[in-house]
Amino acid sequence: MTTDIFFNPMWDVRLTDTSLRDGSHHKRHQFTKDEVQAIVAALDVAGVPVIEVTHGDGLGGSSFNYGFSKTPEQELIKLAAETAKEAKIAFLMLPGVGTKEDIKEAQNNGGSICRIATHCTEADVSIQHFGLARELGLETVGFLMMSHTIPPEKLAQQARIMADAGCQCVYVVDSAGALVLEGVRDRVAALVAELGDDAQVGFHGHENLGLGVANSVEAVRAGAKQIDGSCRRFGAGAGNAPVEALIGVFDKIGVKTGIDFFDIADAAEEVVAPAMPAECLLDRNALIMGYSGVYSSFLKHAIRQSERYGVPAHQLLHRAGQRKLIGGQEDQLIDIALEIKREQESGAAAAR
């Protein structure tokens, strides 16, 4: 079964709001049904075309390793689909975390866009999942996470694997918020050149170096047709590119999205902000993640281990970057914390 990409000919770019997925990291996966319903309704009124809803780590992510959801994600997907009048509901899945059965259940609950994420060198593990999603008639999007870690030409080769498997849009995903302007431009351009008309190209940014909006503009100018953001930067680390700022900038440079600037600003201020446990901050921890290239969802895990072992979170994050840890290796923060703790104790003993 084939499915067309949901893309209004009046748009230059399709925007996906990921507050209810990436924001789940910041909220420690504690969304309530009332919050999801209110946020979806507000985004829908503003004209946001795609709203992503799942556990922060995708389908099946509710676990001891990643953190348990307050409300089962499939219930939230169903509620979001019932609430949205115009917007499509997307869901994320990571092979090895989610399963084919999870994809089928998400579709049955009203999800219509399946976004499949792998580390940027492991696109081949997504092949069977893209095949299933296309058979089911789902629109497909591929995420090449931690895209800053390999050069553009290598990233393009991985994008080709996804496109050949049935992916209709491959994203350059700056999971660490580590890419700087031309780093985004070169990677997006490489994917556009490789994929041609076979698939669109997208960009997912984080604010860890304060460049989420600027990097998204670079991506669009390099040929990206899909862009991610989160209202109020509601996402992992310092958060994602704020949708309300993206729309303001896109309006000013003539990039059409179909989203009303004033309505999305209202949604961010009046509906999304009250659901946030705190603002997403560009603080020392977030900056270290962007500077050292650390997966943004490590932030809350690092803070937890910092409190548990009495070591600085920013040091944990810096060493995670030095070790080139990727998503799924959050448990190694415990080893790093113990290492720093031993160093502190030996240093204190030597000083006596």
Swiss-Prot record:
Enzyme Commission number(s): 4.1.3.39
GO terms of biological process kind: catabolic process; L-leucine biosynthetic process
PROSITE patterns reported for this sequence: PYR_CT
Catalytic reactions of this protein: (S)-4-hydroxy-2-oxopentanoate = acetaldehyde + pyruvate
Domain Pyruvate carboxyltransferase stretches: 13-265
Binding residues for substrate: 21-22, 175, 204, 295
Keyword field: Aromatic hydrocarbons catabolism, Lyase, Manganese, Metal-binding
One Pfam family hit: HMGL-like
Entry keyword Transferase: no
ATP-binding is among the record's keywords: no
Entry's Gene Ontology molecular function annotations: 2-isopropylmalate synthase activity; 4-hydroxy-2-oxovalerate aldolase activity; manganese ion binding
Residues binding Mn(2+), per UniProt: 22, 204, 206
Annotated site location: Transition state stabilizer: 21
Catalytic residues of the enzyme: 25 (proton acceptor)
Gene3D superfamilies for the chain: 1.10.8.60, Aldolase class I
Assigned protein family: Belongs to the 4-hydroxy-2-oxovalerate aldolase family.
Matches recorded under NCBIfam families: 4OH_2_O_val_ald, PRK08195.1
Cross-referenced HAMAP family: HOA (MF_01656)
Protein name: 4-hydroxy-2-oxovalerate aldolase
